[in-house]
């Protein structure tokens, strides 16, 4: 056995996911026991972000949202989104989107993005808003986007 796995056992399948909340941060993912090798700063068109009280996306022609694309396992996604459902009562479901890397060194790619269809309006948690703006800046996403995030406080 190596690393708790049987020799010759295949690695779990990884899928590409666009995170637009604090999960865009490798440090935040690590708090959930999820270790990613690379976070690709990216943009997704025709969506807008809102925080009321948690972060979510809404369809909006001409708008763009920013975040990070990572490779994670289905088990890791379950851990994240089952935790959010248990803690906040929010059911985020996967949607396919096209993520465009900020640095044009790679092609746009289809990725999963998790969005909730229903969220009761509420005041955002100021600490969460600050943490999200910090994550945006850490990925060198546009400062105007960090300011947009901060405007939810």
Q: How would you label these PLM feature ranges?
A:
Residues 2-153:
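Glycine-aromatic micro-motifs
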